[in-house]
């Protein structure tokens, strides 16, 4: 018996047809490990064999003769024969031929190609197309859902704007990426050695590598996924022992959709008795400083206050905290360093002759700005203190760009100065604002500034010029915060604005007093006001409708008392948190030594 386009012996069972050189590619059976499925063509051959055996001897011989003659004909003869057959077909037969051809001409190319080539093809699809591809078949689903594909998708979108689609997804969890990436590379190499070399030894196509795909230039923090176990195995790929990258992508995509459509819920934190001057947000821990001379720490998972730091004799104007210490500046002219887990003040730094208005620090350096018009550099090691002079008005904001060796400062004199950490000299002065510069924000290589002239400006530090001016607030802008995806601003008009690509996309209104401080997270906007209230706009797990009702969370006075155990539990999510609280000392808090007050080097710009 002959079937299809080439000769096939009738004595050979149709469900055990071996691949033959004279068969077309679509006739080859898909033999996969642990998979008993067969191709559509193989099923048709088996069906025809069964129908043929049910015919009379004369009819069977007539059909076999037609098949044999067609198989022995040349290509041009076959075309001519088909044209003649089709011309003699009724409408019902033509309809049957059309439906039959529709399934025969389809080719599952991903099943025929080497797996790494399939990955390469799928890597050009967007997220929606990948989800649609996963619905084609089980084999396509395994390929389209694999970590290799979705890890690349996460690298392309998370914490950055995709150049192709313009979407960027929030970072959310901040754990290292390199271990997960190395695990995926190992899986990929194991796959190519195990599957491709055995099933496609004759394939001349060069194997693609994971390193060929575009990857992130910043491989610090992308996913909360732990690497899969190297000892686990599965039918096709190593199984997921933790959250798959597709799930990670989907979670962040939901949050980004909430950002885009303005879907959020609102929470109000009440605890300060006077205006909120400064905020800092690290994951689910929020620190706030106020005119009431206190610093409060909040757990945003429960919206509860977990620590109260008291010691300043006047309003707290600025603060920053890391894994184990919090540094604050005050209108009492001092800088205090706290072990915020025990609410203990570790050190007090004196040096400024007027209110300390701003500060920032990294692993080796503390920079502060004051109403005395100076910028001070406090070195954690060696005790050296340097004073930078050049501003003619109070210094309201300072920032460190460590990889460039620069310090930035913004002042009431309407200027922004760039200082060299190597020479301690002023390299350049920006002077485009016509009002006091209140806040500076850095995102990637972009510098933003806001002023009481009601504008926000974006600067090119390399070219030393203003590249964008953002208008939207009707009164002075007090503070801004930025990340890789967006910028937020709080102003004297009592509103908070969310900006993307230099355009205002949302305006958040609920404050009854001027907004004096803001903080930006991956899925939240935080703002503080002169009325002492802190507003949170939460874009994760947002309801379908917007706006939503406000949830107020009043906090009773702690009177400076809070058990260490509750603080430790609340702060356990802070990155690199050590459970050994008893070992915290002045030395490992990494603070300027007490003799820093005696080694003041004054630099005039």
From Swiss-Prot:
Keyword Membrane: no
UniProt-reported outcome of changing residue 118 to P: Temperature sensitive induction of early growth arrest and small cell size
GO molecular function annotation: ubiquitin-like ligase-substrate adaptor activity
Start and stop residues of the WD repeats: 271-299, 311-339, 350-379, 390-420, 432-460, 472-500, 510-538
CC annotations in GO: COPI vesicle coat; nucleus; SCF ubiquitin ligase complex
Residue ranges occupied by any F-box domain in the UniProt entry: 107-153
Keywords assigned: Nucleus, Phosphoprotein, Repeat, Ubl conjugation pathway, WD repeat
Extent of Polar residues compositional bias: 214-231
Record-annotated membrane-spanning stretches: none
Residue stretches of biased makeup (Basic and acidic residues): 195-212
Lineage top rank: taxon: Eukaryota
Annotated region (Disordered), positions in chain: 195-231
InterPro entries (UniProt xref): F-box-like_dom_sf, F-box_dom, G-protein_beta_WD-40_rep, SCF_subunit_WD-repeat, WD40/YVTN_repeat-like_dom_sf, WD40_repeat_CS, WD40_repeat_dom_sf, WD40_rpt
Pfam family membership, one: WD40
Subcellular location(s) of the protein: Nucleus
Record has Nucleus as a keyword: yes
Record PTM Phosphoserine, positions in chain: 229, 232
GO BP annotations, alphabetical order: endoplasmic reticulum to Golgi vesicle-mediated transport; intra-Golgi vesicle-mediated transport; intracellular protein transport; retrograde vesicle-mediated transport, Golgi to endoplasmic reticulum; SCF-dependent proteasomal ubiquitin-dependent protein catabolic process
Function: Probably recognizes and binds to some phosphorylated proteins and promotes their ubiquitination and degradation. Required for the inactivation of zip1 via ubiquitination.
Assembly description: A part of the E3 ubiquitin ligase Skp1-Cullin-1-F-box (SCF) complex. Interacts with cul1, skp1 and phosphorylated zip1.
Record-given protein name: F-box/WD repeat-containing protein pof1
